[in-house]
Amino acid sequence: MLPIGIFYQFYAYFALVLSIPILYMQLRARNIPCLLLLFWLTLTTLIYVVESAIWSNPYAETIRWMGYGLCDITSRIVTCSSIGIPASAFTLVLYLDTVIRRDHPLKRYENWIWHVCLSILLPLIIMAMMVPLESNRYVVICMNGCYSSFYQTWYTLLFFYIPPCLLSFGGLFFVSRIVVLYWRRQRELQQFFQRDSQLTSKRFLRLLCLAAVFFLGYFPLTIFMVVANGKLQQFLPFNHELVEAWHQESITYYPTTKVGLNDWVPPTVLYLMSLFFSTSGGWTEKVALILWSLLVWLPFTKNTALGRHAQFKLDCCKSIESTMAGKTLDSTDFKEKCLVLERQWSKSSIPSDNSSELQDAAKYV
């Protein structure tokens, strides 16, 4: 394996490790758009890093396995991810736009069907529409993995290359509109976020900045992909002969000495998400908790000094959580007692109009 391949292995796997606390945070927050974006990013990163390790020797004259069965599935997942990643980021912007235009907090899981359809169903439909234009089952690129191979037609341009551009451009439009609305309604939104238990002002701005940086980087990338594919070969007119020639070409293996641009995008976005979510207070604690749990779980570190230290840290975290929970219960009990005393004091201090109470009071005069 070349040095660039070794570096990519560490780069991608560390991005997957950093995505675990983000996934935990978003599951607790029940943020469906972020979970959909994490789904596509982690799945494609895992596919890229595994396949780049399988076909890692560019100087091999022949390869023993052409990926039969595995590449039939992963190549189509990669095709779906080219639409699913910008679509799920677009649903995140739609969610923020819905929040900022409402005068009351959103209901939990509101519009989740629309988000799932746009992020999952739309990529599956586009992938199914592109299957008849496959020149062969897939191609295997060394240090990159398996990719679908399409005939370059105007049909491919319209249904495969243009949708990511439109989704990225729409995301930039909604981001700019959200920024304008937030600037105009800043005072009203501060009161709104105080009423909403699921979304605070910091969380809203964090998600907005994440979406803005994502689309500012992803939109030029989609334009570059369209221009690059257009320069490499001309787009042919669509005809039935191309459909009849489906899978007529054999599976091709391309030896290369570099990792393609597509393989770097998903792990880089995971690093970007980790950077933004690391500004939250509990992110570092969650990362440390996951790492300590991993050291305790691994058999070759469980009985070592490092494993015992990790177990000590986990026990300390559990004791702190139980102490904080006890203090919370004590504070709630104290508040309830104060409310009861306040009600009793108000009843005794406010005179009543009941004549029986006046008669009882006259006995002691």
Curated annotation (Swiss-Prot):
Primary residence: membrane
Annotated family: Belongs to the G-protein coupled receptor 4 family.
Subcellular localization is given as:
Membrane
One Gene Ontology term of the molecular function aspect: mating-type factor pheromone receptor activity
Protein name (Swiss-Prot/TrEMBL): Pheromone M-factor receptor
Report which gene this protein is encoded by.
map3
Swiss-Prot/TrEMBL induction comment = By at least 3 types of regulation: the mating-type of the cell, nutritional conditions and pheromone signaling.
Q: What job does this protein perform?
A: Receptor for the peptide pheromone M-factor, a mating factor of S.pombe. Pheromone signaling is essential for initiation of meiosis in S.pombe; M-factor signaling alone may be sufficient.
Q: State any GO BP term from the record.
A: pheromone response MAPK cascade
Span-the-membrane segments of this chain are: 7-24, 31-54, 73-100, 116-133, 155-182, 204-226, 265-283
Source organism of this protein record? Schizosaccharomyces pombe (strain 972 / ATCC 24843)
Quick check: keyword Transmembrane helix in the entry?
Answer: yes
How does this protein lie in the membrane?
Multi-pass membrane protein
InterPro entries cross-referenced by the UniProt entry: GPCR_STE3
Q: Keywords assigned by UniProt?
A: G-protein coupled receptor, Membrane, Pheromone response, Receptor, Transducer, Transmembrane, Transmembrane helix
Q: What's a GO cellular component annotated to this UniProt protein?
A: nucleus
